[in-house]
Swiss-Prot record:
The keyword Glycosyltransferase is annotated on this UniProt entry: yes
Pfam families for the chain: Pribosyltran
Protein name, entry field: Adenine phosphoribosyltransferase 1
Keyword Transmembrane helix: no
Gene: apt1
Cellular component terms (Gene Ontology): cytoplasm
Length: 180
């Protein structure tokens, strides 16, 4: 697995000083554009849940839709998009969540997950954890059981993984990058 993980890390483009000076943006579009790396990433994201009954995969906008859809397909689970407010056409449930520099809102269709269903969160990256914590709270608000969260990238210096684990969510990541 170590070789696979180093190959995945090498397939992620790092862009310095984007979107702000001092930030290194981790761009997974290069991973997504490489069929072998994309397949390996999805296989590795799915691996901890093989043989586990998972009702739904919840993907966070926007790259979580790509990865989450692939994970849902592999696990024969349904897929639930968690979107920024105002983007879904039917009856929704919404929650405000904290960002590094403010507050935003996310929503999902109220009927997308039934109480008691087992759900895994999927996104490309966990940094401060604001979005993932908000998504966890949103899913729990409607009675879902969040049984895990998986991300291609973890930025451990920003503490997001720890915040999710403090909520009792088991976190699975593939690649760690230090710094911001």
């Amino acid at each position: 697995m170590g070789n696979t993980i180093s190959e995945l890390a090498a397939s992620i483009r790092s862009i310095p000083d984007y979107p702000n000076p001092g930030i290194i943006f981790r761009d997974i579009t290069t991973l997504l554009g490489n069929p072998r790396a994309f397949r390996r990433a999805v296989d590795e994201l799915v691996q901890p849940y093989a043989g586990t009954k998972v009702d739904k995969i919840a993907g966070m906008e926007a790259r979580g839709f790509i990865l989450g859809g692939a994970v849902a397909h592999q696990l024969s689970s349904g897929f639930v998009p968690i979107r920024k407010k105002g983007k879904l056409p039917h009856d929704t449930v919404r929650i405000a969540y904290s960002l590094e520099y403010g507050v935003d809102e996310m929503e999902m269709h109220r009927d997308a997950v039934q109480p008691g269903e087992k759900v895994i969160l999927v996104d490309d990256l966990i940094a401060t954890g604001g979005t993932a914590v908000g998504a966890t709270q949103l899913l729990r608000q409607i009675g879902a059981e969040v049984v895990g969260a998986c991300f291609v990238i973890d930025l451990p210096d920003l503490g997001g993984r720890r915040k999710l684990e403090e909520l009792g969510v088991v976190v699975h990541t593939l690649v760690e990058f230090s710094g911001h």
